[in-house]
Swiss-Prot record:
GO terms for biological process: antimicrobial humoral immune response mediated by antimicrobial peptide; cellular response to lipopolysaccharide; inflammatory response; neutrophil chemotaxis; positive regulation of cell division. The gene is PPBP. It comes from Sus scrofa. Disulfide bonds join 54-80, 56-96. This is Platelet basic protein. One of its GO terms (molecular function) is chemokine activity. Belongs to the intercrine alpha (chemokine CxC) family.
Amino acid sequence: MSLRLGAISSCTTSSPFPVLQVLLPLSLLLTTLVPATMGAAKIEGRMAHVELRCLCLNTVSGIHPSNIQSLEVIRAGAHCAKVEVIATLKNDKKICLDPEAPRIKKIVQKIMEDGGSAA
């Protein structure tokens, strides 16, 4: 270390630009990651991802009720303008049912009357 008055520390001569070159990409990365994690919501003590689109693209209008293991009815909302009915079959396959089909309406009504055990 020098005690001369004309000596300049290396800290004062370094440019702040390398720090900015690191902070800018880091801040851009964080701005893309934070909104992606905000889509997760805590429901009944577990984490569930909130989809902001309709889940059912194609629907089936005819299925035998004995093939259905469970049924999930998703109301229309900001995520989707229509009601969605998703059935989990006994072979663990999930299919979307047409909520407007008379047969599907009867299946949903029967399950709701039975106490919603297949909800």
